[in-house]
Swiss-Prot record:
HAMAP family named among the record's database cross-references: Ribosomal_uL5_B
Protein name as catalogued: Large ribosomal subunit protein uL5
Any Gene Ontology biological process: translation
InterPro entries found in the cross-reference section: Ribosomal_uL5, Ribosomal_uL5_bac-type, Ribosomal_uL5_C, Ribosomal_uL5_CS, Ribosomal_uL5_dom_sf, Ribosomal_uL5_N
Organism expressing this protein natively: Clostridium botulinum (strain Eklund 17B / Type B)
Recorded family membership: Belongs to the universal ribosomal protein uL5 family.
General function of this protein: This is one of the proteins that bind and probably mediate the attachment of the 5S RNA into the large ribosomal subunit, where it forms part of the central protuberance. In the 70S ribosome it contacts protein S13 of the 30S subunit (bridge B1b), connecting the 2 subunits; this bridge is implicated in subunit movement. Contacts the P site tRNA; the 5S rRNA and some of its associated proteins might help stabilize positioning of ribosome-bound tRNAs.
Cellular component, GO annotation: ribonucleoprotein complex; ribosome
Superkingdom per UniProt: Bacteria
Primary gene name: rplE
Length: 179
């Protein structure tokens, strides 16, 4: 059992019951999955760029990413249908908790001028989206071995029904929200 899973079962569940007054244990929101997406726009000219993005993402997430492809051809963007344009990873269970722990305790504090993540990035259904501008904040990525600084989107999918419940869940888990 990971450190964050233990924290969830020992501290977060009682705190959520106290705050929201749940009657049933199954009502308590929990993390369902974390999706990490890396869109690589320059992959349309050079497919080799995608390989380094895939290797970076596999180091960060700890599992092999799948390629995301264009659904339709768009002449203005010079993309064809089924052309690989990025990669994504879906983390669940233990790997999800390990990644969330690493993100909150190690990676986010390494961001320059970090004052906390925005508390407004909820989608209305209890899911939280977070954009990261550079992959260098993760300890697995070595500065000398990257070809280009890339950003990524990280989406926390929860079972919460409202944004307020999801915000409290992530806050109890240790997400550093800006005041």
């Amino acid at each position: 059992m990971t450190r964050l899973q233990e924290k969830y079962s020992k501290e977060v569940i009682p705190a959520m019951i106290e705050k929201f007054g749940y009657k049933n244990v199954m009502e308590i929101p929990k993390l369902e999955k974390i999706v990490i997406n890396m869109g690589v726009g320059e992959a349309k000219e050079n497919q080799k760029v995608l390989e380094s993005a895939v290797s970076d993402l596999s180091l960060i997430a700890g599992q092999k990413p799948i390629l995301t492809r264009a659904k339709k051809s768009v002449a203005n963007f010079k993309i064809r249908e089924n052309m690989a344009l990025g990669c994504k990873v879906t983390l669940r269970k233990a790997k999800m908790y390990e990644f969330a722990d690493k993100l909150m305790s190690i990676a986010l504090p390494r961001v320059r001028d970090f004052r906390g993540v925005s508390a407004k990035a909820f989608d209305g259904r209890g899911n939280y989206s977070l954009g990261i501008k550079e992959q260098l904040i993760f300890p697995e990525i070595e500065y000398d071995k990257i070809d280009k600084v890339r950003g990524m989107d990280i989406i926390f999918v929860t079972t919460a029904n409202t944004d307020e419940e999801a915000r409290e869940l992530l806050r109890f888990l240790g997400m550093p929200f800006a005041q």
